[in-house]
């Protein structure tokens, strides 16, 4: 096994170069621009991957004639990125970059009946709301708020601005002890003591302000005086808040808990704030799991949101609910789809909802008919769609696969697609990608498992190739047609490896029984599924059984550690990134206790709890004496600490 190449793959993000020039206006600012990289050998490299522009959000003009979107460019030497705005016609023609600044334009939307584009930018050091003409001229700052504006939504009548900004919710050590003004230490007296990558001293709050088109006034904190988050950390954004159609109510997502209660519960709710009365109503109080991402119907008669049933289970089925705003009747409308509802959007007449969801290793667009709650797939093929939105009588979405990053497409209701953007064509034209195919394999318990196999470019079945087993993280994250800028299968394949990526037990898109089997059974059937995948592929004459490797991150890192103690000399090399090594220490150290309690089944000291005892009996550290294969270890995880790699 070429160990140097294998290690390089896990660290591909560390090596690259993108173009950058000094901005003429401010000599200390570097303008990171589109790369003109030249690639030799037609193989994917870390440099090529980092040179790619990354398409972000998009917005369709009110008349349906224009599309605005953002693209981020990266510079490894500068250790940062820069996001710019593009505008194109509805058919993809006349695509123009309309900003050329180092100021991170993002969250672009159309305002003032499509005559202006609104966006966030940090021109003057903090993130504020700006506007410009659709050709990039007439740039104007609209807000001068004291803090950063992290997300925003302008009301349907155009007269109010809903925005997100951080509010201080906890005293620092220096606040508590004025005689120690330079103190930076953290005094921990309660959970959660941190959340992912930060010591939690602030919370995002939703604010509403009057907006006259030139600035804001009469700013109101919807959660004034409350220590809660809306949107919820660490990943929530403006999608967790929504205007009603008459611009006098805001629905927001919030988990109104603190301390230990916050650390053990996923019970968030949808609250509706009335701007006129300043009263708040909880419309999902009876549900005990996550309730998130509200959207009002275009006719104003309904509200839809995503809902998980069980408290503490962060990977529960993400169901779509709607509520009749007149009668209060609630309905679980996505029962016919036994997988998670991801992005969704109402049809203009409110009789249909379009959504994306993973099924059998692909994220497709579906139509949900609210007359009978039937679900029909619109798209097909080896792709993942995301970020679906209405586009006249069509849909618009981003699409990617294991062989291509995000581009923007239109989708007709019969499933035909048109690619609108060609952001990285100049790079793809220089590359030869490896073939991707799906194989169904019989597992040890007689079920069928979809496994993706990625071959090297110019694959020759008469040769023998080193082969990697890829172990997915999550643990309940799909092995769909994802495109990764970290664990990129085409970079691995470009170095003449075959990659085997099984949809082992514990992944969505194959029904609830398949998805839920992993909870409390980390060392069980999912590990047998891994062995099935690599053993089946090892039967192929072009797989070199003497050069098998195994790689993974997060739960995949745990899998690597566990397999290292049980692989019976199958593998010649491992790579573990961000994996749990000692389950007992993980239970004590991790801050999101709901995850540990549900997935591990309880605490390790609960001797009468058979699920917990099975979990901790399968901790990888208990099998170290059986390790006989090198394992490069790295950590940047925010829920499994670097101490797991010691």
For each of these PLM feature ranges, what is it?
Residues 34-53, 219-225:
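A short helix->beta-strand "capping" segment at the edge of beta-propeller domains
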Residues 16-17:
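C-terminal motif of bacterial Sec signal peptides marking the signal peptidase cleavage site
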Residues 493, 501-646:
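Active-site-proximal cap/loop segments of hydrolase catalytic domains
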Residues 89-93, 133-137, 211-214, 274-278, ...:
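Short loop/turn segments that connect beta-strands within beta-propeller blades
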Residues 52-67, 102-120, 139, 146-161, ...:
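Conserved beta-propeller blade repeats
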Residues 77-81, 123-126, 198-202, 261-267, ...:
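Short, solvent-exposed loop/turn segments at conserved positions within beta-propeller repeat blades
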Residues 423-540, 544-546, 553:
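Cap/lid segment of the alpha/beta-hydrolase catalytic domain
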Residues 25-33, 83, 166-225, 253-269, ...:
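Predominantly five- to eight-bladed beta-propeller fold
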């Amino acid at each position: 096994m070429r160990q140097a190449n294998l290690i390089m793959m896990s660290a591909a993000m560390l090596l690259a170069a993108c173009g950058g020039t000094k901005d003429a206006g401010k000599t200390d600012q570097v303008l990171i621009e589109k790369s003109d990289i030249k690639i030799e050998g037609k193989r994917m490299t870390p440099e090529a991957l980092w040179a790619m522009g990354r398409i972000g959000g998009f917005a369709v003009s009110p008349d349906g004639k224009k599309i605005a979107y953002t693209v981020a460019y990266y510079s490894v030497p500068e250790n940062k990125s820069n996001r710019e705005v593009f505008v194109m016609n509805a058919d993809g023609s006349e695509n123009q970059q309309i900003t050329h600044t180092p100021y991170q334009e993002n969250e672009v939307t159309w305002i003032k009946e499509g005559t202006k584009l609104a966006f966030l930018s940090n021109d003057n050091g903090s993130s504020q709301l700006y506007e410009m003409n659709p050709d990039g001229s007439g740039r104007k700052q609209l807000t001068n708020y004291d803090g950063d504006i992290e997300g925003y939504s302008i009301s349907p009548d155009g007269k109010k601005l809903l925005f997100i900004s951080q509010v201080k919710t906890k005293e620092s050590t220096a606040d508590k002890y004025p005689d120690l003004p330079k103190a930076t230490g953290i005094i921990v007296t309660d959970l959660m003591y941190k959340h992912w990558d930060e010591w939690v001293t602030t919370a995002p709050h939703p604010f509403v302000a009057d907006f006259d088109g030139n600035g804001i006034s009469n700013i109101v904190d919807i959660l004034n005086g409350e220590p809660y988050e809306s949107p919820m950390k660490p990943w929530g954004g403006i999608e967790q808040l929504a205007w009603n159609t008459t611009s006098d109510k805001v629905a927001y997502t919030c988990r109104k808990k603190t301390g230990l209660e916050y650390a053990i519960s996923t019970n968030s709710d949808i609250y509706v704030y009335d701007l006129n009365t300043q009263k708040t109503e909880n419309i999902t109080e009876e549900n005990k799991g996550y309730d998130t991402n509200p959207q009002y119907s275009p006719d104003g008669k309904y509200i839809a949101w995503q809902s998980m049933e069980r408290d503490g289970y962060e990977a529960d089925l993400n169901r779509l609910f709607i509520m009749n705003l007149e009668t209060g009747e609630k309905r679980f409308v996505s029962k016919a789809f036994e997988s998670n509802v991801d992005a969704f959007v109402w049809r203009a007449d409110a009789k249909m909802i379009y959504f994306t969801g993973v099924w059998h290793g692909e994220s497709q667009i579906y139509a949900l008919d609210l007359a009978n709650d039937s679900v029909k797939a619109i798209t097909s093929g080896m792709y993942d769609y995301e970020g679906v939105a209405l586009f006249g009588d069509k849909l618009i979405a981003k699409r990617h696969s294991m062989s291509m990053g995000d581009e923007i497409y239109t989708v007709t209701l019969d499933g035909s697609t048109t690619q609108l953007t060609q952001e990285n064509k100049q790079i793809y034209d220089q590359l030869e990608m490896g073939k991707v195919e799906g194989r169904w394999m019989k597992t040890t318990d007689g079920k069928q498992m979809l496994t993706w196999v990625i071959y090297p470019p110019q694959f020759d079945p008469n040769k023998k190739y080193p082969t990697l087993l890829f172990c997915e993280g999550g643990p309940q994250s799909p092995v769909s047609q994802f495109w990764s800028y970290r664990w990129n299968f085409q970079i691995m394949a470009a170095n003449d490896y075959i990659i085997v990526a099984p949809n082992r037990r514990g992944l969505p898109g194959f029904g609830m029984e398949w998805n839920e089997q992993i909870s409390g059974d980390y060392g069980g059937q999912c590990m047998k599924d891994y062995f099935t995948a690599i053993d089946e592929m090892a039967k192929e004459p072009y797989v070199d059984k003497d050069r098998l490797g195994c790689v993974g991150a997060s739960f995949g890192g745990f899998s690597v550690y566990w397999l290292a103690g049980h692989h019976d000399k199958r593998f010649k090399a491992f790579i573990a990134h961000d994996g749990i090594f000692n389950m007992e220490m993980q239970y004590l150290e991790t801050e999101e206790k709901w995850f540990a309690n549900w997935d591990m089944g309880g605490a390790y000291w609960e001797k009468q709890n058979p699920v917990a005892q099975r979990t901790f009996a399968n901790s990888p550290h208990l099998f170290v004496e059986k390790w006989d294969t090198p394992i490069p270890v790295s950590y940047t995880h925010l829920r499994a600490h670097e101490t797991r790699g010691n």
